[in-house]
């Protein structure tokens, strides 16, 4: 989850540890298939194009295959809603069993957003400083040059290049 802007999302994130809990049997079937056929759900995960596009995938069975490893949550902005705080139907936006396996860094969460742990080092609570503070959408969600998100590596989103293109 890299370089996103979450506006009034409840929750902004949802990451569970299903392989360590209620779905613990499913990974066992995938592990058996990988050992017998060299595939997971019929996909040759350890061969191109998967092994070249996702090099860490080739070793997925060698290091706690049931754990939600490899998830990176970095350089995101959250305004309103809930960043990592449980809300409504969701018992947890980030399951506690999953947290030790995550890499979370350089995220900016606006003071108006709900957070589970305000002392977390995975984010800073700060105004992201949209160019058009009163109506970020009208300002195409562009950030002021002094934005704390830009200082943490967030890249401006190219909204002018996103969307439908006319066919030739």
Predicted regions mapped to residue ranges:
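C-terminal accessory segments
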Residues: 65, 119-168
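Glycine- and acidic/polar-rich repeat regions and solenoidal domains
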Residues: 1-121, 126-138
């Amino acid at each position: 989850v890299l370089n996103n802007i979450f506006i009034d999302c409840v929750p902004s994130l949802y990451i569970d540890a299903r392989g360590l809990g209620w779905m613990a049997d499913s990974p066992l079937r995938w592990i058996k298939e990988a050992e017998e056929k060299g595939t997971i759900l019929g996909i040759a995960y350890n061969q191109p194009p998967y092994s070249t596009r996702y090099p860490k995938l080739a070793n997925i069975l060698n290091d706690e295959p049931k754990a939600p490893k490899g998830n990176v949550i970095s350089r995101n902005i959250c305004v309103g809603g809930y960043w990592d705080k449980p809300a409504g139907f969701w018992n947890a936006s980030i399951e506690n069993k999953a947290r030790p396996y995550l890499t979370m860094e350089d995220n900016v969460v606006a003071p108006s957003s709900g957070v589970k742990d305000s002392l977390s080092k995975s984010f800073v609570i700060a105004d992201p400083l949209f160019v058009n503070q009163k109506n970020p959408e009208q300002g195409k969600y562009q950030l002021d040059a002094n934005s704390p998100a830009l200082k943490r590596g967030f890249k401006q989103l190219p909204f002018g290049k996103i969307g439908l293109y006319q066919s030739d």
